[in-house]
Amino acid sequence: MALPKNLIPMPRSRFLRVKCIDCGNEQIVFSHPATKVRCLVCGATLVEPTGGKGVIKAKILEVLE
């Protein structure tokens, strides 16, 4: 009997480096947020929760591991 490659599955959630569309501020956010994530500079909404993966309203620059 063959063993599966990953005995411990990796999480599907990630941290993302995003750039605010309004002011250009770069910020690190979670991909599955429980609350609204706002820009620290201008207050614009960057990510909205949906009960799972959030709706990202900013430009994704990098996916952090």
From Swiss-Prot:
Record PROSITE patterns: RIBOSOMAL_S27E
Gene Ontology cellular component annotations, sorted alphabetically: ribonucleoprotein complex; ribosome
Cofactor mode of binding and number, as noted: Binds 1 zinc ion per subunit.
Pfam families recorded: Ribosomal_S27e (PF01667)
Keyword Nucleotide-binding: no
Keyword presence, Cell wall biogenesis/degradation: no
Known cofactor(s): Zn(2+)
Assembly, per entry: Part of the 30S ribosomal subunit.
Protein family membership: Belongs to the eukaryotic ribosomal protein eS27 family.
Protein name: Small ribosomal subunit protein eS27
Gene that encodes it: rps27e
